């Protein structure tokens, strides 16, 4: 462990992060929204923090180990959430609300404690969207592209930050080139989405803001009514398309764009599984909507949009779903537990893990029926080793245990079971909106619950193992 090297790297990254405040400063000047002092103070304070750290470690040679990689990833998201909370705190929010909002933004969860978005300054609204966009692909992956220029290796950090199978493969020979390719795709999707939003009726401000949170699968909006504010089928269709694109593995986008292999989508088993699961969830939701009586029966348009939004773990809405059949709302919440594809910007357990667990369970059942048979575990045409299956089951076990512990913590704080279950599920899976008391926002829950849920967001963003590893005594043993 090299603490001074870690501090030096943090200082560089915090200094880079401080430059992001230039954008809300420009927005504040354009709209004259009165929030300019907030972002000027934030820019100065965060920049000074980074510069002081750099000065104190100016002669340090960066030599990062595997252990350092884990610490950097975990601590950076914590430091980033704390520094990112400054504008919210200076705007009058409490400390816990500020950290909650910042953590929700940077982890692309989309849960909010703000109950009146339409009354906020434009610069603060834009800042929320910007947090999600930067967190979408992972600020660490962005930093990897510049780390080689600073003499810092990024390979271990890349494997720690990028979830699922994608972290084990290099799309290009060099980590830096991989990060740059992913960010070019990410930026390209954002630009196209923003242009399409604008051409279909959004203002320039709303188009840019919603393009960032759509492609980031974040779910933050500049309006209380979310995407429903625009009441436009074309905007909803665009939103659906880009939520899906961001829920697919970015490795597939890379092969389609850079290698001219669009058929990779059709032949990818995880892609097919995700689409099949989405369609099955949609079919069940439609059947519930048409055959289960409730105070309000949702339209087919509402069901389709909300199903895609929930399964991709985005969290956008086009109408109030609190009066929908509870079975439908619960179904869509469970859909978020499965989540998006590995190598995407979405949350949840991830489709490839679900595939491996289902196939492994099927293999064991077949072994019981045919004890002398030799049955290999396959995903598509590729064999999967038992060590991989064991790792996936280990992840799922820790996931369930973490969920139960977080749920008990929230229940102890006094929240009802429906609200507590959905809040933990929504935050652990980086979804955002829940059911019951947290269906609209998280403003009315107590400070302890907000702290627990902020931790759940971080746990989900780091795919559990990365965070829990550094909490074990063995990790810190020499």
Regions found by a protein language model. Name each.
Residues 1-478:
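Membrane-proximal intracellular helices of multi-pass ion channels
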